């Protein structure tokens, strides 16, 4: 078909058709029938206009090309074949000079004699069906429609055919010739059917009776019958101008497209209020580990055994006391809960055989901390129908919080390297295909860059805690089970290491639905003094529980050891996703891989090795108030991983909403940077949608602040 088109049509027509297909992202090598259809339509538009002029008296005359009077005014302005921007410029100019109403869709011609736009149609089907589709799409009495078919039929608005019979006969003859030439080459059947794809069951199967009535009843408003709606859908052009598309959708929609310029966007407004607080399920940069190297004790691998062994490595325990109370809680209960944990661990050690699990005594302090008997009684709705003032209980609007510097510090820390290895290289058999070889090479390079990263530690810690808590919630539903918070890693020298961060005590956990909540109390070791950033620890009661000797360059020094205690809650679905935090590694690897692919396609060879081994090259990491931050490929890997991990740790409806809405603004800004001249409508509504997600979540507030930095530097 492509060869036929190039032989059959004028090279100028072919070139214009190629440009049109490129503009709409279509491949003429694949869409060959469409290529032929565009060329045919262009040629008919040119033939419609050819030889038609207006003389000094304003009459329409037909003049051959070699006639000396060819300088007369052309009767028709050709709009089809121009690029969209130029075509709309011509249409606007005509409307301004003639007073014609601006069409919603680009027409093909303008007739200066009749003062009207013309839409030309060339169809391989019945002319009246195609005419109906065009009329339904355009919905304008000011645009004249003229349809030609390959069988010599034609149809025009009000049977007004505009041209003289000889000019129309020339067009019909040309279309018939094209059909014959296609048929001779065996191309016609495919071309004829491609206008609406292959023949469908609906075309052969008449809908009647009840189904027909149901179809007519199910139509959207403003459609009287199924045929009208079908014609409208078939004539709906996805790449038409936006205003036209909107007006097609509903008569009530009247969007004015505003140009989006460098001066258009304003910064996102962050909320005012007290500073935001830490809301992760476990401590991040402030966590302290009690560790044992090369564990070989009896029961190694059983969490309770490992925890007791780690506790024995510390000798600086002292009488605990509260250094930062929780403003709304009964703080002595938190203190008593920690003392109870110490006492019950001591009881275990005195036993002959250490049990595999430990259920805490149901003391008053634990009952309070775990919300035992605090839930309102559930009553069957049927028993309440007669209560006159039955209503849902009032809930307060969340208090707005401002961005605080601690969350940026947390993120920076998550990107850093630790002195331990948190993930192993997977043992995989021999590669059998080149693609597997490249994939495993990329994975190995990536693993080497992130295996020491603190964000990877958070992944392993999160996986362990969520797995242990979900298991205990199912296995010991009524018990207050003590769950050690443990992780495992290797030292740089390859020695195994078991770490204890603290303990969790689980409350009652009859979790029937995914969203049913299990309460727990977390008790985590730390060297961070909470009085330095009290706002960060709003939800915590912090105890001082010991003194730790630390080795430094100037010798040994003693630092107070703190215990961060809080009541928290989670659900089956949250624990299920927490158990799958390793997915963060995969997500960030895929992002790195897309960067490698982009580089490889430019260089036309796989660039994996160069990408990771060229240590001198820097890559953009993100935006800050200083501008675009750059770093090594390893830093890029760790930053992408940290972002993915924080999306998991701080998952919330606020984050979902902000990500979805800010992405729309981001795409418009990127279109502006790419000189695509974007337009917007209701930009204020988009800002409103973004800003209603900025309430109190620290990670969302930080992302909004980063977005503002991006706006500042992107639009310079």
Swiss-Prot record:
Amino acids binding Mn(2+) 1: 41, 108, 119-120
Subcellular location: Host cytoplasm; Host nucleus
Main enzyme class: hydrolase
This protein's GO CC annotations: host cell cytoplasm; host cell nucleus
Record PTM text: Phosphorylated on serines and threonines by host kinases, including human casein kinase II.
Subunit structure: Influenza RNA polymerase is composed of three subunits: PB1, PB2 and PA. Interacts (via C-terminus) with PB1 (via N-terminus).
Family: Belongs to the influenza viruses PA family.
Protein name (database record): Polymerase acidic protein
Taxonomic source organism: Influenza A virus (strain A/Port Chalmers/1/1973 H3N2)
